[in-house]
Amino acid sequence: MRLRTLATGAAFVLVPLTLTVFLLIFLGRIDPAGALDRDPEQEGLEAILTLRMSHVVAENTPKGQAARYFARRAAELSGGRIRVEVFPNGALFSDISELDALRRGDVDLIAPAASNWTDRYIEWQVLDLPFIFRDLDDLNAVLNGPLGTLLKEAPERDGLRTLLFWHSGLKQITTNVRPVLLPEDFRGLVFRRMQSSTIARYLELLGARTVPAPFNQTFPLLEKGMVNSEENTLTNIYSKKFYTVQTDLTLSDHGYLGYPVLVNDAFWRRLSPDDRAILLKALEEAGAYELRLIRELEARALKEMAASGLRIHRLTADERTAWEQAVAPLYDEVAVRMPPPLRAFVEARKPR
């Protein structure tokens, strides 16, 4: 009788214990170490890194295509784990508001025109000096050297990091008044310009007046006659159809239009070393792709704009010299604001 009672009592204890263990195993999926398994699907979602990139030019420009190429390569190099959402044409932010948006963390990457921020980062004023670079190869040699490091460090005081520079190319002049070949041809012209006191000053030295305005307002300003001239790269002139409201294009190669690719430094430091390496590699490959596109698209744009009836003029050596002499005083004005290495560079490149 006693044995039966003990057996019965054991059964009452065993049943709840067995049920409890079963429920824990079935619902909690206990592993030998006592930890709950994680949902693999949820882990996959957590592993995906999504970044938003904003820029203000058209998708069919070198920068627009480079941004798409960057997004594609980042996905490929990460096995689909890194997703870059690209917003072109100022869809998220204008070229005036995008830097502050990046500082606030409202966007992850931007590629603004350096010229819009030369009053904030005075080192970048060197990039706006007319005729300071002979060509894109010369420019790349400078940006990839010690002077390039100084230029990249400028935004760090705002908590931003320059990853590298992308290019749009060298700038040309368009107008609907007359061909611009000599400094006196600038007199009476009204230029839309970027937010750069350096650009304002060299156009003033050439005899023109200027109106600062965001990039996406350039076409309406030209169309309505509020300005009659502008400077830009061939691909921007073509893709934004500026040439349709202008009569003359001067191939001057007088200035550089470049795009530092910027990130918020705090955001960048939160990324893993592997993710940073993937993004840098994708950006570098996109930059090389962009340079190839510039040469290809500029030739096509020039041909199609000429076919539309736009009058195209190329500066002669003597005309270029006249422009250089007219803007030479600006080199002295900029040099005194630069740290010693950049000052020496500006002084060495001053037109003689």
Regions found by a protein language model. Give the residues of each.
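Short, solvent-exposed loop/beta-turn-alpha elements that line the ligand-binding surface or hinge
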Residues: 134-157
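N-terminal secretory/targeting leader peptides
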Residues: 2-133, 162-352
